[in-house]
Amino acid sequence: METLNGPAGGGAPDAKLQPPGQHHRHHHLHPVAERRRLHRAPSPARPFLKDLHARPAAPGPAVPSSGRAPAPAAPRSPNLAGKAPPSPGSLAAPGRLSRRSGGVPGAKDKPPPGAGARAAGGAKAALGSRRAARVAPAEPLSRAGKPPGAEPPSAAAKGRKAKRGSRAPPARTVGPPTPAARIPAVTLAVTSVAGSPARCSRISHTDSSSDLSDCPSEPLSDEQRLLPAASSDAESGTGSSDREPPRGAPTPSPAARGAPPGSPEPPALLAAPLAAGACPGGRSIPSGVSGGFAGPGVAEDVRGRSPPERPVPGTPKEPSLGEQSRLVPAAEEEELLREMEELRSENDYLKDELDELRAEMEEMRDSYLEEDVYQLQELRRELDRANKNCRILQYRLRKAEQKSLKVAETGQVDGELIRSLEQDLKVAKDVSVRLHHELKTVEEKRAKAEDENETLRQQMIEVEISKQALQNELERLKESSLKRRSTREMYKEKKTFNQDDSADLRCQLQFAKEEAFLMRKKMAKLGREKDELEQELQKYKSLYGDVDSPLPTGEAGGPPSTREAELKLRLKLVEEEANILGRKIVELEVENRGLKAEMEDMRGQQEREGPGRDHAPSIPTSPFGDSLESSTELRRHLQFVEEEAELLRRSISEIEDHNRQLTHELSKFKFEPPREPGWLGEGASPGAGGGAPLQEELKSARLQISELSGKVLKLQHENHALLSNIQRCDLAAHLGLRAPSPRDSDAESDAGKKESDGEESRLPQPKREGPVGGESDSEEMFEKTSGFGSGKPSEASEPCPTELLKAREDSEYLVTLKHEAQRLERTVERLITDTDSFLHDAGLRGGAPLPGPGLQGEEEQGEGDQQEPQLLGTINAKMKAFKKELQAFLEQVNRIGDGLSPLPHLTESSSFLSTVTSVSRDSPIGNLGKELGPDLQSRLKEQLEWQLGPARGDERESLRLRAARELHRRADGDTGSHGLGGQTCFSLEMEEEHLYALRWKELEMHSLALQNTLHERTWSDEKNLMQQELRSLKQNIFLFYVKLRWLLKHWRQGKQMEEEGEEFTEGEHPETLSRLGELGVQGGHQADGPDHDSDRGCGFPVGEHSPHSRVQIGDHSLRLQTADRGQPHKQVVENQQLFSAFKALLEDFRAELREDERARLRLQQQYASDKAAWDVEWAVLKCRLEQLEEKTENKLGELGSSAESKGALKKEREVHQKLLADSHSLVMDLRWQIHHSEKNWNREKVELLDRLDRDRQEWERQKKEFLWRIEQLQKENSPRRGGSFLCDQKDGNVRPFPHQGSLRMPRPVAMWPCADADSIPFEDRPLSKLKESDRCSASENLYLDALSLDDEPEEPPAHRPEREFRNRLPEEEENHKGNLQRAVSVSSMSEFQRLMDISPFLPEKGLPSTSSKEDVTPPLSPDDLKYIEEFNKSWDYTPNRGHNGGGPDLWADRTEVGRAGHEDSTEPFPDSSWYLTTSVTMTTDTMTSPEHCQKQPLRSHVLTEQSGLRVLHSPPAVRRVDSITAAGGEGPFPTSRARGSPGDTKGGPPEPMLSRWPCTSPRHSRDYVEGARRPLDSPLCTSLGFASPLHSLEMSKNLSDDMKEVAFSVRNAICSGPGELQVKDMACQTNGSRTMGTQTVQTISVGLQTEALRGSGVTSSPHKCLTPKAGGGATPVSSPSRSLRSRQVAPAIEKVQAKFERTCCSPKYGSPKLQRKPLPKADQPNNRTSPGMAQKGYSESAWARSTTTRESPVHTTINDGLSSLFNIIDHSPVVQDPFQKGLRAGSRSRSAEPRPELGPGQETGTNSRGRSPSPIGVGSEMCREEGGEGTPVKQDLSAPPGYTLTENVARILNKKLLEHALKEERRQAAHGPPGLHSDSHSLGDTAEPGPMENQTVLLTAPWGL
């Protein structure tokens, strides 16, 4: 024991010396393992092991050896030898050792030793225990001679307490600790011994020592169990301190080697042995001791350490004897020595075993480690591969970014790249399909493996159970034998044989009970298994019914009905059998229970009889007595019970076998899917057992049927091939050989083409050899198989015959086919009725059946609304024809009694299916088509599926949108629909034979009929229908979104009650507008045919539209059409935007609901607290009441009337309680009433506020109308104004402006105010008045607009069209009008505007547009500027609220932007949108170039408007406003634009821009919570709303730059919310740049301003801009002083824009750069706008941001939206070519136009880009476009330019847009190269100042937005 302990302890000490794990490992490994290791082949795992071993060895020979020896050898061998039974203990000890050693290896080694110990222990259990007692002590003594005394005590205490007697107890006392100590000591000794050998380089010794240590370690486990604490103490040196300390002192040197880690005492023990032997000897001795206790000789021989070992044992023994002599008598010492010898021999044996185990373990560990290493290497390789791939992808990404940038610069689309990308996409799709199939197969394999695992697990469990039963039997036999012996002894002892017998019987009964219990458990388990199997069978059955849909294609080939029937039958039989067996089991259990009860009775009886029988003779003959009889009876019962148990066992095994069979069958069922072509062959295999003859007959019948049907199919295929060829030829003649790819035609998205393709799509579809677009191989295959008419009849026919025959075999297939056809007929009827209703609606709407928010624009835009009813009519007619055909088909099906299906119809339907899949690919439901493809494919392989597929295909075609779920369901349920046929195969065969000829004829007839119908049903009709439905769906979704937003607004209004009333009305506007769009309100729409398309493009037509605006919209819609068809991606983007807006809205809802929940929780808490307080108060009152009652009782008692007083008190208390309850309920009611009255009052207040806003808007609109009319009259009176303005209005509106003008804008000029420009008209009227009074009013108007932004919020929606209309009006008109109109919205502002108009400082807008910058009135007087600045400051922070605008606005922006974009493209420069881009831009434009405004009118009609619209692009809100404003400006407020027309880009566009901004901002003021997005909301509904605010924003272009800046900042402050603040800041910055002072300088200043503004303005609020303005027009906004001022002015805004400011202000992006570049290139603003620059700046910078590949230095540095904008600015200065600017504008316009998806806003952005050569413009446009596309306004704000840029770049690449932009630029250049161009983003303009400002504005706009 000591030895064991010693090794254990030694292990611990070693651990101290070294990591125990290492020691142990070494010990374990060292002995034999070490040798083996030397010869072992190198393995990747080994290096680690070697290192570990080497390290342990390195620490010190003693340590390593000690580690090795102690861990396994010393402890284990003694323990094992000494205590076989303790083997488990030894295991535990090794566990401890391993833990201490940290030994992974140790742990591994230990288990094996443990095992060895068990084996040894098992054999020597008894001996082991006794020896353990004796030997353990002896061993320790002999081995270590160290603390034998101590060890013996522990061992003795355990093993031979009796023998040692007095000695043992002392040993125990000291022992437990001592053994622990000793264990360490021994271990140390062993370790030292091992170590010494190691030192001596005695491998053998080391091995032996390690072996010994191993052996001891196992034994240790036992001792350690007993002495775990002791051993640990010993290790620590505490346990062994008693005796060992002395030794420790002497032995420190020897022990130091092995035991030093251990406690000093172990070293002491070791010291003696070590001292006895040489260093090697000592080592050998310890090893000998540890390993050789049992037989030192053996150990020596084995390990070659015999001499040292023996000396060692001797030495240790003597010391141990000496120790023991102290503790134990000499006699015992001899006995101990003998025991030690025995243990030594045993230890040697065990050591050998341990060596083997250790070697095995090492090998295992090596293998494990090798696996790990290989795995690691594999992972590393994978990592390397992934890194390489990443690098490659990064490289590709960089290349792609460079390409895209190049494309953006050159505007050329790389068709080859697109084609290659398409090819890559196809390949990727095919790969994904293939991978999907592989995944399925892998999944199946995995399921199989899992099932196998489960069965194996069950088998293991069964084996365990049987093993347990056998063990129980063995134990019972043992016990019975023992009992027999004991009974004999009892007889001998004269115990009553009765009792013995009864005891024996009781034991047997107990065993029987246990067995019965086991059986019950087993039976229950079997029952559970049976239930599970039954459930699985049930599941599989249910699955099997639907095999077709759920199963993979391979399994779904079509469930052969015969095989299914057989399997079902067998399943039923099996289930019945299982039920019978289950019942039997239950019966047996009942019987078993009865027997048990009988046994219990018998036992009780016996026990009762027991006392009486005591008298019975005790002779063995007692069996003859009564007791003997009862016992014999019991025995008989027991035998009976055992027999019953045997029967149960047998039945259970039978049931298990049966279950196994079932599970096997089930797994076969599951994992052996029928081979598709091989149904016939397989049919019999699964359930072949009993129905062999039947199956043979079935096979023959199937073969016959397959032959017949094969012939039929071949004929049909040939027939169809001929028909399809003929049709193809016809179609080729018809369509000019466009047949090849219906999908290609789709991509072209020509409505006519689609129709023609629809015809050919069915036939030509098969022609496609390879996947087109997004098709996959499976789809291609599907097409081949699905269309008999496919070019390869052989391909189609080959797979089909057998499958078709199989499918036909089931009459059920026919039934399901009939059901499907009927369902299809019903669907067709529904479709026809729907189309009729559509036609009716279309008639009502005048040709705009589905005016959606630009959703329907795809086809109808080009065709015009009138085409829709016709198209629907043709669709309806064709659907009716199809219905007739379907009815004929149903009749034919009815005639065919059998399962034969009319193949021609199938063919058609299959072709339809392929068409559907192709269509669906193009359509938003493309995924559906792709999913259907494979499903349908698998089904088409069966005839029945062919039949169903076609019908379904038709249905899908017609109902792609409506029936998406049905499609999925059918696709999956095709086979499911085919139930098992009621008819037998024989009847089917008979029917096949009889009806063969009839069918053939009918099929031919049917194929001809189908051929006729093929031409009727064109695929374009289907696509048109789908698109209409899609549009209606989108519209409905959008309406739902708007209503949700309205609801949310109401909700918040109810909650907040402050400015929410205004927000509420604004919220309503979008809804109203959307409703208008939905209804197709066509006041203006009907007026002009072209406008119908434009209306659609706009999304929400407004009642009044100017024809011009319609024209613009029409063009836009055309662009959208081409873009949409060419790029289904646009739809995806729009959908994404819509749904992202939805998501944002839902998030808002969730936030509101959470707030409500929180409020509810607060109320609950309050209620709980109040209630608790009330309870406390009530308790207090109750106590007082009781006290009072007691007092009163006492008094009353004294008085003698206690009873009465009690009654009175009770009554009184009850009354009080009642009163209290009543008062409580009253209080609660009152509280509730107050709460609700407050709510109602809040609601009423909000409603009143809304009403007030609406009334005020109405007043404003009327006022604006009057003003506008007066202005018009004045213009008519004044030849210059009248001619240019009116003409511009009319002509301009018709030309480019029509595009800009939204549908709303089309409303006549007179009606303009009514165009929902509630606030705008109001403001516009003042503006127009101002314009009339003073042409310089444009600048003022900007300023006033900025001031009046508050009023504009609600008007914006209506105003937008007006503004757009105005934009259309000649810029001269706008200049004439002057932006001051807007100022009127604010009464004080209107007064101010009038003053401004009169003021000499303002340049006149009335001046001819041709007037040059010189004409511009001087900037406002410093006083005026200060006043404006003050005013702006007052307003500055209000707008912050407005910025919370959400997704809805983005959505609206998208639609509107798309429309605006179209309009913009029509106009060379959408000035208004440009201004919209940033209020600053507007202000700057207006202020910068009154002359620009004047000049701009010339090209403003086209260019200015477009610029404005494009400007819209940068911010979605701005976009909307812009599109509306541009269009509106052109129309009703062309005057405003005219005012700005000199700088129409600046002035006119500024108006629209400002209008939008104001719209945004006023709303923002109200909707600050909702933010700028809300302004977008109104744009959502229509651009009308924004138009008016924008117009209002238009300030007189004559305002001085400073004034404009101030006005703009004011407007921004008013209009923009937090988000808008940024815009304002940016606008301010832009304005600042424009405000630069001199118009000419403006351009240069623009750069500086942009920088300073960016640095300051961007970061700071509009106040900053105002501050620079206050500084004076002379100071460029970009000037540092201004920027500083601006920062000081608006800290709050600075915070908002801080992020932008940082980048912008940083030297990288820093205003310094901008200042430098813009200033030096002040003359090059146009150049900046050069296409390269613009694209670079706007597309690259924004793009670079998005891609993180920043080619341009500026872009690279710039990380946020502002920086990108700045980069754009930097770039724009670089290019000076007006032409380049034009290119850039073109590219922008392209981006906008390709963006048609985005909407007019996008185009506007594009135009504005064209207008403003500055990259900033581009950036803003990009932002707008991006926002329009689907990026939220936030995106626009942050990095919209970049992100949008990437997408926009592609669209910008549109050549048409480029050309258009170039044209516009040329026009611009021609019209106003001077200031005008700069204002109108003079792409063509050489006037740098304007362009610079515009660029700056653009930059600012994206930021602000």
Curated annotation (Swiss-Prot):
Question: From start to end residue, where is composition biased (Basic and acidic residues)?
Answer: 601-616, 741-770, 1356-1377
Question: What superkingdom heads the lineage?
Answer: Eukaryota
Keyword annotations for this protein, in alphabetical order, are: Cell cycle, Cell division, Cell membrane, Coiled coil, Cytoplasm, Cytoskeleton, Membrane, Mitosis, Phosphoprotein
The answer to whether UniProt assigns keyword Coiled coil to this entry is: yes
Q: Where is this region: Necessary for self-assembly, microtubule bundling activity and apicobasal microtubule organization?
A: 1-508
Q: Where is this region: Necessary for colocalization and binding with microtubules?
A: 1-249, 1678-1773
Residue ranges annotated as coiled coil are 330-404, 432-483, 513-718, 1143-1201, 1238-1278
Q: Which residues does the record list as Phosphoserine (modified residue)?
A: 77, 87, 217, 221, 263, 549, 618, 685, 776, 901, 923, 1278, 1385, 1388, 1399, 1421, 1514, 1523, 1561, 1578, 1583, 1592, 1661, 1679, 1683, 1791, 1808, 1812, 1814
Q: Which residues carry this modification: Phosphotyrosine?
A: Y1427
A Gene Ontology cellular component where this protein is annotated is:
spindle pole
Q: Compositional bias of type Gly residues: which residue ranges?
A: 680-692
Q: Decide whether keyword Repeat is in the record.
A: no
Q: Where is this region: Necessary for interaction with MARK2 and apicobasal microtubule bundle formation in polarized epithelial cells?
A: 1265-1382
**Compositional bias of kind Low complexity:** 63-95, 115-130, 268-283, 1678-1687
PTM note: Phosphorylated during mitosis in a CDK1-dependent manner.
Q: Which Pfam family, any one, appears in the UniProt record?
A: SOGA
Q: Where in the cell is it found?
A: Lateral cell membrane; Apical cell membrane; Cytoplasm, Cytoskeleton, Spindle pole; Midbody
- Ranges for the region named Disordered are 1-329, 544-563, 601-631, 671-694, 737-800, 842-867, 1080-1100, 1346-1384, 1485-1505, 1524-1569, 1655-1689, 1707-1756, 1782-1842, 1863-1905
Entry function: Microtubule-associated factor involved in the late phase of epithelial polarization and microtubule dynamics regulation. Plays a role in the development and maintenance of non-centrosomal microtubule bundles at the lateral membrane in polarized epithelial cells. Required for faithful chromosome segregation during mitosis.
Subunit record text:
Homodimer. Associates (via N- and C-terminus domains) with microtubule filaments.
Indicate what this protein is called per its UniProt record. Microtubule cross-linking factor 1
Q: Which source organism?
A: Homo sapiens
